[in-house]
């Protein structure tokens, strides 16, 4: 204060003068002239009021003096001295000052008002911040806070704030306040973080800007860092606030996503919120559980999934998925970005095994193992995925399916696990959060490694070329493998456990493979687009190992055809070979494809997104806005990636084939050819289970698929957009998309197809998904026909592999939709 008072002696006086005026208004405010006093009082009025105000102030000050003693004393002495001086000069200067300041302040306050208006923060908090901001302001605030925090603040801002800002207090006070605010922010106490911005606004627009910046940075950092607290807080608090800030965090997610709208939002709030919510809601558990647990969470879900796996998983998981997904999804949606990141991250995480895709190519080897894991993963994924997948997948798928598809898929896949995480986290920072989420999530998720790599990797990768490739691959792999990866070994066992293990595995593999296949198609596409070759290859390798293992030979041939057919026979074969699993893959491919189809439906959408690069189309369709936006972006990229091209084919192929099959449930049938063998079984068993897994896988896949292509693109291209988009549209898209997957459920399939067609009837699917899950398989048939019809439509979109029914996928997907939607909303 001394330095300040000295440096701003005159200024202080001015401030005081202004303050007295502020006081007047404040006094007035106290009096009851809250709004009016602020802008209405003229300098003279202020003077007169000021006199009384000062008296009041002094009185109040004294009153608050004890509380404000340190602050007030500092300010009091200085202020009083200055005030005394000012009292004399006050009339003259303050008037001018106040007029000028007022004008300036008016400008500031206007913005500030808006910002400040939020004074949801307790006056006390404001007080603290304010007092911290400026002793004078602080104590004034204290005095005034109770009366009209907002107005006083604004007025204060007018004078004290504006002047202070002008003065240099911004440096000291503002900085101080900022720091305090940040602290508060960190504490989440006041939302100072949030409001600090407001408060800062109060402090000054400059400060607000700084704070906002700080906040944003801080929040982002926080997001990335502890800020989770802040974020959480913000998220939590913000959830509401954030919602406000974000949108409502999208739900929370939405709002949060919107938070994206908020500046922080995206970065922090949204993800944070959602993420947090999601993370909290699900991610944290899911995240931790999910991610870490991925097996764990998923594990639980896994167990559940395993237990309920197919149905239960679907159902159970879905609920959880839905449940979490809802939250999560929101997160996911939100995750979009972060999601994406996380997604990626997740992917990465998941992928990490994949090598995070970066290694994707290498990882392929890695992945390969993961592929081995892949199955497990898949199973886990299947389960996890189911759970997650369902949960995430759903989210993911949908999300991924569309815009999310791209991203979500990435997200989804990993997100499946991570999705929540990714979702959540991603959501969180969206981008920064993304990373943070990524890190956080990943870290949290356990995927830390993955995350790290993923985050770094994946995000980067996925986002970057890797985004495509990694995405493609990762997703592909990740989707395919990472999940597989992570869980793989386990999963595989579990999976194996399940018969589906192999099938599932195969399936998973299929998913993986399929995913890879589909994905690969995607990947291929992606590959085309991204490079995928590695992914492909890897998939091929990974898949081969895995898939091959299952029906590397058989499916591959068949699937290969389809797959190959779908995207790149060449590649597909690679993949497909792995897709061997393709039989499963075929199935899965169906599933995956289906998923793809579903996803594709989404994919279609996404593919549409991707295909059209129909990013627009699908995205437009699905997430048109977001999807479009992200997808468009993403998609275009994907399109670029080839996803558009390839994916379409794959999408088409997958969707077409898958979808039709999906439509059919026939996946078993259709897939039968490919899936036939494993699929039939798998499908049957897995169908439920596998479906889940497959779906998951598929979902995963598609996500991977779509996502890879898209996400890769998205990741890469739209990462940010994606993030937001993903979040946004992922949510929406995911919703839409999710549904498709849900639709995919078979009933959903049809819905899927329908959804796909509809694009998301997904919503309906959303509803359906869970329910249909069980039905899915069954309904799949009935729906299958419908779906077939739809598939026909989709077929148009994805004529290639119509045969393969993505019945499975549906399950995974639907969860998301529900979740996503809110987020979307």
Swiss-Prot record:
Compartments reported by the entry: Cell projection, Cilium, Flagellum
GO cellular component: sperm fibrous sheath; sperm principal piece
Keyword Phosphoprotein appears in the UniProt entry: yes
Principal place of residence: other
Membrane-spanning residues: none
Biased composition (Polar residues): 21-40, 200-220
Compositional bias annotation for Basic and acidic residues: 277-290
Pro residues compositional bias, start-end: 610-676
Record field: compositional bias (Low complexity): 348-357, 398-407
Matching InterPro entries: FSCB
Annotated stretches, region: Disordered: 1-43, 113-139, 168-232, 244-718, 732-751
Function per UniProt: May be involved in the later stages of fibrous sheath biogenesis and spermatozoa capacitation. Inhibits ROPN1 and ROPN1L SUMOylation. Binds calcium.
Subunit note: Interacts with CABYR. Interacts with ROPN1 and ROPN1L; the interaction increases upon spermatozoa capacitation conditions.
The protein's name: Fibrous sheath CABYR-binding protein
């Amino acid at each position: 204060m001394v330095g300040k008072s000295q440096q701003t002696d005159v200024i202080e006086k001015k401030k005081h003068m202004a303050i007295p005026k502020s006081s007047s208004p404040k006094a007035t405010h106290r009096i009851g002239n809250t709004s009016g006093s602020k802008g209405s009082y003229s300098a003279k009025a202020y003077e007169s009021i000021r006199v009384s105000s000062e008296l009041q102030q002094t009185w109040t000050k004294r009153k608050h003096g004890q509380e404000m003693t340190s602050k007030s004393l500092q300010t009091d002495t200085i202020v009083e001295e200055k005030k005394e001086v000012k009292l004399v000069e006050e009339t003259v200067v303050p008037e001018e000052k106040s007029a000028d300041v007022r004008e300036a302040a008016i400008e500031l306050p206007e913005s500030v008002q808006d910002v400040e208006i939020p004074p949801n923060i307790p006056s006390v908090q404001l007080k603290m911040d304010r007092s911290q901001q400026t002793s004078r302001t602080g104590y004034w605030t204290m005095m005034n806070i109770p009366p009209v925090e907002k107005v006083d603040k604004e007025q204060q801002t007018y004078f004290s704030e504006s002047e202070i800002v002008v003065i240099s207090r911004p440096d000291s006070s503002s900085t101080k306040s900022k720091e305090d605010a940040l602290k508060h922010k960190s504490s989440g106490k006041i939302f100072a973080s949030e409001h600090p911005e407001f408060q800062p606004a109060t402090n000054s627009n400059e400060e607000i800007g700084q704070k906002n910046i700080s906040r944003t940075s801080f929040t982002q950092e926080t997001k990335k860092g502890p800020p989770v607290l802040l974020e959480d807080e913000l998220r939590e608090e913000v959830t509401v606030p954030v919602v406000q800030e974000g949108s409502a965090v999208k739900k929370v997610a939405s709002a949060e996503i919107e938070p994206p709208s908020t500046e922080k939002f995206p970065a922090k709030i949204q993800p944070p919120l959602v993420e947090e919510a999601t993370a909290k809601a699900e991610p944290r558990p899911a995240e931790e559980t999910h991610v870490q647990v991925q097996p764990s969470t998923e594990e639980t879900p896994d167990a559940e999934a395993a237990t309920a796996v197919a149905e239960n998983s679907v159902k159970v998981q879905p609920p959880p998925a839905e449940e979490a997904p809802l939250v999560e999804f929101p997160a996911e949606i939100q995750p979009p970005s972060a999601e994406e990141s996380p997604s990626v991250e997740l992917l990465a995480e998941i992928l990490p095994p994949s090598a995070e895709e970066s290694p994707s190519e290498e990882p392929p080897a890695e992945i390969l193992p993961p592929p081995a894991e892949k199955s497990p993963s898949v199973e886990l994924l299947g389960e996890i995925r189911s759970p997650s997948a369902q949960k995430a997948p759903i989210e993911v798928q949908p999300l991924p399916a569309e815009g999310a598809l791209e991203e979500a898929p990435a997200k989804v896949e990993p997100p499946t696990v991570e999705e929540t995480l990714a979702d959540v986290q991603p959501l969180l920072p969206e981008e920064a959060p993304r990373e943070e989420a990524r890190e956080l999530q990943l870290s949290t998720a356990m995927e830390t490694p993955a995350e790290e790599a993923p985050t770094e990797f994946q995000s980067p990768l996925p986002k970057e070329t890797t985004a495509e490739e990694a995405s493609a691959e990762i997703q592909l792999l990740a989707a395919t493998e990472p999940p597989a990866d992570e869980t793989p070994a386990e999963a595989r066992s579990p999976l194996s456990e399940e018969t589906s293990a192999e099938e599932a595995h195969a399936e998973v593999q299929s998913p993986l493979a399929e995913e890879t296949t589909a994905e690969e198609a995607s990947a291929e596409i992606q590959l085309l687009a991204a490079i995928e070759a590695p992914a492909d290859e890897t998939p091929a390798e990974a898949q081969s190992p895995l898939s091959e293992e299952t029906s590397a030979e058989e499916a591959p041939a068949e699937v290969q055809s389809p797959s190959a057919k779908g995207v790149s026979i060449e590649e597909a074969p690679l993949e497909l070979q792995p897709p061997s699993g393709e039989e499963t893959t075929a199935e899965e491919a169906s599933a995956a494809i289906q998923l793809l189809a579903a996803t594709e439906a989404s994919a279609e959408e996404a593919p549409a997104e991707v295909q059209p690069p129909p990013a627009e189309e699908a995205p437009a369709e699905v997430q048109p806005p977001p999807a479009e936006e992200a997808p468009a972006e993403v998609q275009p990229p994907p399109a670029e990636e080839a996803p558009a091209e390839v994916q379409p084919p794959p999408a088409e192929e997958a969707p077409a084939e898958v979808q039709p099959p999906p439509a059919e449930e026939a996946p078993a049938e259709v897939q039968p050819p490919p899936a036939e063998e494993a699929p039939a079984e798998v499908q049957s068993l897995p169908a439920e289970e596998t479906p889940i897994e497959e779906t998951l896988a598929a979902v995963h896949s598609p996500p991977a698929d779509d996502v890879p292509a898209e996400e890769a693109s998205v990741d890469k291209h739209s990462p940010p957009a994606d993030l937001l988009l993903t979040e946004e549209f992922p949510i929406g898209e995911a919703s839409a998309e999710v549904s498709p997957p849900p639709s995919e459920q078979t009933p959903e399939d049809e819905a899927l197809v329908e959804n796909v067609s509809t694009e998301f009837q997904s919503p309906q699917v959303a509803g359906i998904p869970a329910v249909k899950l069980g039905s899915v398989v069954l309904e799949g048939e009935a729906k299958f026909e419908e779906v077939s019809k739809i598939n026909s439509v989709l077929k148009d979109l994805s004529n290639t592999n119509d045969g393969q029914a993505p019945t499975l996928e549906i399950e995974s997907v639907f969860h998301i939709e529900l979740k996503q939607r809110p987020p979307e909303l």
